[in-house]
Structures are given as C-alpha cells and as structure tokens.
Amino acid sequence: MKVGVLGGGQLARMLALAGRPLGLDFAFLDPAADACAFALGRGLQGDYDDPACLDELAEFAEVVTFEFENVPAAVTERLAAR
C-alpha cells in the first residue's frame, strides 16, 4: 500500500519506520527541504497548500494521513476530491 503523509517530521518518520517492515511505501509532503522523514520514502518539498505538490501526493498515495493537526481544511478537501 502507498501512504501519503502531510508532514515529514519525527512522527512521520516513526510512522514509516513502523510501516516499511509491513510492506508500506511512503511519500511525505513538507515545506522543509531537510525533513527527517524524507530519508524513508518519497520526499515532496513544498507548502501544504501547493496544488502541484498535493496533486503529486494524491497520484502516489492510496491513502493520505496527517502528521499534525493544523492542516488547512481546503487541503483535505482537495485531496478528498481526488
């Protein structure tokens, strides 16, 4: 299964460390170019509301989850529409 994660920090890294042995593949969207989770999957560096990054994440992922709770509602609506 391919999992998209909004956020690429410590929690996203721990999620990937737990999921990779189960055969899960990950993509992370984070504004920081050096997000620590990027080492464990596909790293998408960009703002959370960047349409191109969101589309790329949606193309990759079968399911999307969040690393943190402050994701703009418009972002989740855009992903849900895909």
Feature annotation, model-predicted:
Residues 1-82:
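ATP-binding N-terminal substructure of ATP-dependent carboxylate-amine bond-forming enzymes
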